[in-house]
Regions:
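Active-site flanking residues adjacent to catalytic metal/cofactor-binding acidic residues
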Residues: 40
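Rhodanese-like catalytic fold shared by cysteine-dependent sulfurtransferases
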Residues: 1-37, 45-85, 94-136
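Short, surface-exposed ligand- or partner-binding patches at beta-edge/loop junctions that are enriched
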Residues: 89
């Protein structure tokens, strides 16, 4: 018997976006490089290798987010205990909306995500570290 999915990903993303702060790309660009802001790249490592990286961004795979934020987790990353603003992004802004909502529910603040994600970042001509060279 097939599964009956009652809430699709789009509804989850829309609900998250009603709760969280979404930064237009122009605002994200103005925050880049500030000492009190941490950009958190939640894309998969293969995406980073394929598409490039935002200079200075902290990479936190989406699957580890809750474990890295929680100070009681054996996987906690101290960066998430710092008194900073956390700006999440993925490729298009869907996963980062959900990640930002989760971080906010966990008590991390202030948090936001970038509208359009890394795709919007690249389209705006923002700085990127190029993708790793393909292996021969």
């Amino acid at each position: 018997m097939p599964q009956n999915i009652t809430t699709g990903f789009r509804a989850l993303v829309d609900a998250a976006e009603r709760e969280i702060e979404t930064l237009p790309i122009e605002e994200a660009l103005s925050l880049h490089g500030k000492e009190d802001v941490v950009f958190v790249d939640i894309r998969d490592i293969r995406e980073l290798d394929r598409e490039g990286r935002m200079p200075g961004a902290f990479h936190c795979p989406r699957g580890m987010l809750e474990f890295w934020i929680d100070p009681h987790s054996p996987y906690h990353k101290p960066i998430f205990a710092e008194d900073k603003r956390f700006v999440f992004f993925c490729h298009a802004g869907w996963r980062s909306a959900l990640a930002t909502q989760t971080a906010q529910h966990m008590g991390l603040k202030p948090v936001a995500h970038i509208a359009g994600g890394f795709g919007a970042w690249k389209k705006a001509g923002a700085p990127i570290e190029p993708p790793k060279a393909a292996k021969p």
